[in-house]
C-alpha cells in the first residue's frame, strides 16, 4: 500500500513537471511583399512602422504567444543594419536606402519587454521575388561584386548553393545576426528554391 501510494505521488509529480514545461506558441511575421510588416502604407514611415510593431507585439502578448519568427532577410536584403547586405526595399521603398532605425534591434527590445522570444527568419537563396528585377538591386548588393555566385531560374534569381563562396557568404550573414542581436534562434527557409 505504501509502495503504491509513493509510486502514485512520483507519477503525479512527473506529470506536473511535464505540464509546466513551456510550449512554443509563436507566429510568423512576414516582410516580403509587405505581407505582415511593414504595411505598404508605412513603407519609409519609420515612426508608423514602430507603432505598428508595438501594436502587433501587444496583441501577441494578449494571445499568450511566447515567440515571434520575424523575417529579416526576405530577398538577400536586410531589415536590420547590415554591412553585408543592403537595406530591404520592403522596409524603405528602395533597396539600399537606409532606414533611420534598426527594425530587428527594435523588435528584440520590444518583444523581450513582453516576454516574447525573437527568432529570425531568413531566406538564404532567394535574391529576387515578388516581381523584383536584377536591375533593381542596390549598387552595394553582393550580386554586383560576384555575379558568378548566382543563377537564374525562370524570371527569378537565386544564390547558387553548390558554390562554397555562396555558403561562406551565407555563414557570414548568420554569424553577423547571432553576434550582434539578442535573438533566440534562426530559421532558414527556402521553399521557393526551384527544383525540377
Sequence positions of predicted segments:
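N-terminal structural segment of carbohydrate-active enzymes
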Residues: 20-78, 167
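Sec-dependent N-terminal signal peptides
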Residues: 4-13
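Glycine-rich, aromatic-flanked loop segments that form ligand/cofactor-binding clefts
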Residues: 21-26, 65-76, 103-151, 185-190
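Aromatic-lined carbohydrate-binding/catalytic grooves of carbohydrate-active enzymes
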Residues: 63-99
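An active-site-proximal structural segment forming one wall of the substrate-binding cleft
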Residues: 56-65, 107-110, 158-191
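Active-site-adjacent "subsite" loops/lids of carbohydrate-active enzymes
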Residues: 30-50, 120, 125-180
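Sec/Tat signal peptide C-region and signal peptidase I cleavage site
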Residues: 15-19
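Aromatic- and glycine-enriched glycan-recognition loops and surfaces
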Residues: 43-63, 90-112, 169
